[in-house]
Amino acid sequence: AEHLTEMMTQVCGTAATLEDVSSRVPFYIAADSPAIQTLITTYNDVTGENKKPFTMGGGTYARHFPYAVSFGPEHTDIELPEFAGPMHGANEGTPFEKLIEALKIYILALLRLQEIEL
């Protein structure tokens, strides 16, 4: 928080103030860790794609566990019917085939994660 205040003061001078800043220790697991490599390999094996792991801003439930990440398919290219809402939105929807594919990914990933040393 102090670093943010200092940076803002350098950029804005006295034209702005920063109050009630809170921050958390960053939560990060390296992309080359065995667990992340197992997850992305599993995803790519099931889907036939060649995706790379990525990080995102914001907080997730994963930070409440000692060694966890958010993981799952994201299909922004799929056209949904009018009644289906976007990911994490009201009436979230996806085609049934993609639900089955996700289930395969999760089951295989869990089986593979049991075989590695964390």
Identify the meaning behind each predicted range.
Residues 1-118:
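Metal-dependent amide/peptide-bond hydrolase catalytic core
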